[in-house]
Amino acid sequence: MTLNLRVMAPNRIVWNSEAQEIILSTNSGQIGILPNHAPLLTALDIGVMKVRINSDWCTMALMGGFAMIENNQLTILVNEAEKGSDINLEEAQQTFDLAQESLNQATGKKQTIEANLAFQRAKARLEAVKANSSSAYN
């Protein structure tokens, strides 16, 4: 049995396929979703989504949004998303390093909040590309 997974950003459908298992980062922690999951509506945090298709795993960096599960249909609405296979490792590492440096040097509440969001986004992209390159699915 499978789940139908659909990931939508404001300007495009990012992903539309069947999957056996999905792991999401929600605002209250990670959740695993299998076929016949109870209906659920949850907010998503900035983080990595892992998708199992047959025996292979692939990843995607999600930049926050919402997920709705009902009748083996998982619909994810995100602000932005990027497949791990589409991310350049070196560029993601550089962006992460710069974001970490900006966070460490941030002064004031607004600058700290903005730097923290940039750091979380960079971290999600880096984790997605690293997890994707270590999996068999590309």
Swiss-Prot record:
Molecular function terms from GO: ATP binding; proton-transporting ATP synthase activity, rotational mechanism
Keyword Thylakoid: yes
UniProt-annotated location(s): Plastid, Chloroplast thylakoid membrane
Alphabetized UniProt keyword annotations: ATP synthesis, CF(1), Chloroplast, Hydrogen ion transport, Ion transport, Membrane, Plastid, Thylakoid, Transport
GO CC terms of this entry: chloroplast thylakoid membrane; proton-transporting ATP synthase complex
Cited SUPFAM superfamilies: Epsilon subunit of F1F0-ATP synthase N-terminal domain (SSF51344)
Domain of life: Eukaryota
Membrane topology: Peripheral membrane protein
Gene3D superfamilies: 6.10.140.480, F0F1 ATP synthase delta/epsilon subunit, N-terminal (2.60.15.10)
Disulphide bond pairs: none
Main localization of the protein described in the UniProt heading: plastid
Family: Belongs to the ATPase epsilon chain family.
Function noted in UniProt: Produces ATP from ADP in the presence of a proton gradient across the membrane.
Known partners and oligomeric status: F-type ATPases have 2 components, CF(1) - the catalytic core - and CF(0) - the membrane proton channel. CF(1) has five subunits: alpha(3), beta(3), gamma(1), delta(1), epsilon(1). CF(0) has three main subunits: a, b and c.
Protein name per its UniProtKB record: ATP synthase epsilon chain, chloroplastic
Natural source organism: Staurastrum punctulatum
Classification lineage: Eukaryota, Viridiplantae, Streptophyta, Zygnematophyceae, Zygnematophycidae
